């Protein structure tokens, strides 16, 4: 897990693939927040289609590559959790802080990948 976390941290822009509510594949740039308690945490906004898509079908994949063309692809189930500790931790990222200002922002959501595995 530590090697995966290090790779995600070194390559901050990942791509999150979901199945949209229209049944079509969707792929969006995303950013890994951090690992806590063995979970890979990400965040999003509950007004976005990606949030609604993951609620409807939580099976997702995250893909990321390095400038040297090394890459990983992780499959897992997106699990949303009202976890204030994680929300506060996400605020350490200036991009997240700039978008949401505080961990108490009502549109701010965090999720982790349940049973992530490489594919």
Stretches found by the model and what they are:
Residues 11, 57, 93:
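Acidic-histidine catalytic/liganding microenvironments
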Residues 15, 40-41, 119:
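General beta-strand recognition
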Residues 1-2, 44-47, 95-96:
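Charged, amphipathic alpha-helical segments
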